[in-house]
Design a protein with these regions (language model features):
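Amphipathic alpha-helical coiled-coil segments
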Residues: 76-79, 141-156, 235-242
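Regulatory alphaC helix of protein kinase catalytic domains
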Residues: 21-22
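Short, solvent-exposed, mixed-charge loop/turn linkers that connect secondary-structure elements
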Residues: 148-185, 221
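Charged, solvent-exposed structural "stalk/scaffold" segments
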Residues: 30, 37, 41-48, 53-55, ...
Length: 277
């Protein structure tokens, strides 16, 4: 029976060597996408600085430089959030696989003890060959389940190590609370795609403001105003669609947390049952 990874995990936890999730999340800063996004922010900040120092700059030049920096910062936040999400998912998989493995270890111990007891009963005439076959099947199934859990743990640990290096997760003691209701609006405000659309709209409006109706052709003005109206409609539609998705996910958080609590209770009940047996 394979036990080394589960036993090692227990030993590391007992020695205080398990590492908490907040420490793992710090590794997100080292993700390639985050590093590249940070370099882009630094480059756009330098571009803005040069633009502001240029005595010949126009209002449009400054607007574009500021927008470029703001968009780069939004993309950095997105890259960091995505990197953190990947770490959380991998970290959680390791914790879940380890807990499941510990339960299945107990299940195998119980199945093997039951098999030995059945073998003794068969010899004494207290059980039939069918009883023995059923006990053997239960032990075999328990062994197969534990082997699968072992492979799942190895896979989860490899995935986590690929993101943060060698890491022994510490179980999350307390579930996080629900975020504030204003989170949806904050996410909409920071969304890089919406920000890019807002920037494009602001740029078109700035270009329209620079057009002198005394000199610009009416068709050029109308064409620009049509672009502004079309982009405003596109922005409203994109924001509305994203808001619907975010609000749906926000509403799904309470039942999700409740499901986690119930799963924890079921796992604890299973552990106690196998320990009692």
């Amino acid at each position: 029976m394979k036990k080394p990874l589960f036993a090692l995990a227990l030993g590391l936890t007992a020695l205080g060597l398990a590492q908490p999730l907040p420490e793992a999340l710090k590794k997100a800063q080292e993700a390639p996408a985050v590093v590249n996004a940070r370099l882009e922010v630094q480059a756009k900040a330098r571009d803005l600085d040069r633009t502001l120092k240029d005595p010949l700059r126009t209002a449009l030049d400054e607007l574009q430089a500021r927008q470029a920096l703001e968009l780069a910062e939004a993309r950095l936040r997105r890259a960091l959030a995505q990197a953190e999400n990947e770490i959380v998912a991998a970290y959680t998989q390791v914790v879940e696989a380890r807990l499941q493995g510990r339960v299945l270890e107990k299940a195998l111990e119980v199945a093997e003890l039951s098999l030995k007891a059945t073998e003794v009963r068969v010899k004494g005439g207290g059980a039939t060959s069918l009883d023995l076959l059923e006990a053997q099947n239960r032990a075999q199934e328990a062994r197969k389940n534990l082997d699968q859990a072992q492979r799942a743990l190895e896979s989860a640990q490899a995935q986590l190590a690929n993101l943060v290096g060698p890491w022994e997760p510490e179980p999350v003691a307390d579930l996080p609370g629900l975020p504030e209701a204003g989170l949806v609006e904050a996410l909409l405000e920071e969304n890089a795609d919406l920000l890019q659309l807002r920037h494009s709209l602001a740029l078109l409006k700035a270009q329209r403001a620079l057009l002198d109706e005394s000199f610009a052709a009416r068709k050029d003005i109308d064409a620009l105003e049509d672009q502004i109206a079309a982009l405003a409609t596109q922005l409203d539609g994109a924001a509305s669609s994203l808001r619907v998705g975010l609000e749906a996910r926000f509403r799904g958080l309470p039942p999700l947390l409740e499901g986690v609590r119930r799963a924890e209770e079921a796992l604890e009940a299973a552990k106690k049952r196998y320990e009692a047996e």
